[in-house]
Amino acid sequence: MATKSCELVLCFFVFFVISFSAISVSAQTCDNTTGTFIPNSPYDKNRRLILSTLASNVTAQEGYFIGSIGIAPDQVFATGMCAPGSERDVCSLCIRSTSESLLQSCLDQADAFFWSGEETLCLVRYANRPFSGLLVMDPLGAIFNTGELNTNQTVFDIEWNNLTSSMIAGITSSSSGGNNSSKYYSDDIALVPDFKNISALMQCTPDVSSEDCNTCLRQNVVDYDNCCRGHQGGVMSRPNCFFRWEVYPFSGAIDQINLPKSPPPSVTSPSPIANITKNDSRISGGKIAAIVVVTVVTIILVVLGFVISNRRKQKQEMDLPTESVQFDLKTIESATSNFSERNKLGKGGFGEVYKGMLMNGTEIAVKRLSKTSGQGEVEFKNEVVVVAKLQHINLVRLLGFSLQGEEKLLVYEFVSNKSLDYFLFDPTKRNQLDWTMRRNIIGGITRGILYLHQDSRLKIIHRDLKASNILLDADMNPKIADFGMARIFGVDQTVANTGRVVGTFGYMSPEYVTHGQFSMKSDVYSFGVLILEIISGKKNSSFYQMDGLVNNLVTYVWKLWENKSLHELLDPFINQDFTSEEVIRYIHIGLLCVQENPADRPTMSTIHQMLTNSSITLPVPLPPGFFFRNGPGSNPGQSNSKSFACSVDEATITDVNPR
């Protein structure tokens, strides 16, 4: 009985060691040769920020993204990539888990990469210098399968060499087709007589040339042949290329590998990696018990330390991130020529916006809050905390802030084409927005809100979505701006209430105005209004005549729907580059967004699917909120369920008491 107990304990211990090794050993490399950083320094905070948003950016860019955040010397460059054909959810999960693994493993290295995955292959890399287009051969990550080949090595080598050579040739000769994520990718199988199939996968990053890809993959093959020949598979990975083969089918980067109990040393030259030797010495029951006790206690201490550290991290993240993004007031004054009038870009509800240029040549937009503005220090800090945690191609990027004396300044990336309303509601500029451009703007706004609601590590409710808060870059790509009113939701939180309603009339949902209740569906309502404005070129806050009655835009569109004349909504300035079916579908989606009951409105993920997949059947919309039922004795400012006086003012409302 004692022997059986010892055997059970031994089995548990061996299982634990193998399981623990499988988790900790991976094809990741923290590079010590390019410098280190101090934990919680500006560089570290920028690193955490860009990695936290990498998954959403990768999925938004069809499987491949490269970008940077911050200002030198704290600027962090990062890239993320998934294997072609990866499902969005699978890709997003792979990027998120891989990013988190890098943060936990590379504690102070300024350069690191990790090829990872179970259901799909993905890459995450960050560095303190630009690397796009540059072939980097060091360091090398190496893992080999501990199982040994049991076949004729000569015959096996011939098939193995033929397979790897043909794959490399195929990858580098057909690199021009497909999108970035499908460039330089191949998986293949070869049959070894009287043995098993060889499954192999290769991929390069799409930013390098085909010649560099060829060089990188060939060196991976050579390194494996020199270090690990005779084993049943393994992984060789570099920052720009990945190679894996096994004697069984696989999909991800490290799943199902029978990993050694400790990782082999990295290969920097074609020298063999030391094999893991097995010891057959007997271990006494007392020693086994002692080992198990020590192991369990160690695990408990590690978990406890992780929980405490995570709680401290969460508390720190809610504080103002002063170290990473704070600018000296004199720096901002110098960049804007002391807030010169000629540098003024415009004036918003909370102050003025100025163009500036930092000493390193970076163009910036400085939001200078007026001393009498409704946005106080609480809202100011809220905008800094919220935006500093976000990174997406369709969100304006916060570079920093300054809070000195009475001056409250927010420093954003400069977006050259001003805001959407500057074009949309101008009688001469709106003709620059053809249907293709308006459709792309709607799609970009959709992805930005979807990121806020679902894909970022925070759940953000914007609460002030409107045309003037959508900025347009040089390529007319939309960027959501102005997060002063935004609220962070908990993971499981869906609805919140407030006694202080903020936002802009015409864009605010009925339940928010009348009851102070807001949720993701409040943003959906605002987005629906935006869709209708973008298609019509009309402001929701304006009033229109139809059948001799006064209407707001939402009511006007609803009556067009009832009359089956939605085509009348289309802005006459839109060029003839559209189909009426597509335009009507977009109007239909807009009406679904502005339905009175929040439960009837679709989520942003459903909206994205509706916009991108025309085969999805749209439900019939119900009457919208603030639908004016005009008639004898009726008040034109009355909705179908609540009496409410609408304002046509475009300024953001900061203090309204809900009923």
Swiss-Prot record:
Residues 339-611 form the Protein kinase domain. Pfam families: PK_Tyr_Ser-Thr, Stress-antifung. It catalyses: L-seryl-[protein] + ATP = O-phospho-L-seryl-[protein] + ADP + H(+); L-threonyl-[protein] + ATP = O-phospho-L-threonyl-[protein] + ADP + H(+). Keywords: ATP-binding, Glycoprotein, Kinase, Membrane, Nucleotide-binding, Phosphoprotein, Receptor, Repeat, Serine/threonine-protein kinase, Signal, Transferase, Transmembrane, Transmembrane helix. InterPro entries: GNK2 (IPR002902), GNK2_sf (IPR038408), Kinase-like_dom_sf (IPR011009), Prot_kinase_dom (IPR000719), Protein_kinase_ATP_BS (IPR017441), Ser-Thr/Tyr_kinase_cat_dom (IPR001245), Ser/Thr_kinase_AS (IPR008271). The modification Phosphoserine is found at residue 468. It is an enzyme of class 2 (transferase). Residues 28-287 are extracellular. Its EC number is 2.7.11.-. PANTHER family: CYSTEINE-RICH RECEPTOR-LIKE PROTEIN KINASE 18 (PTHR27002:SF989), RECEPTOR-LIKE SERINE/THREONINE-PROTEIN KINASE SD1-8 (PTHR27002). This is Cysteine-rich receptor-like protein kinase 18. It comes from Arabidopsis thaliana.
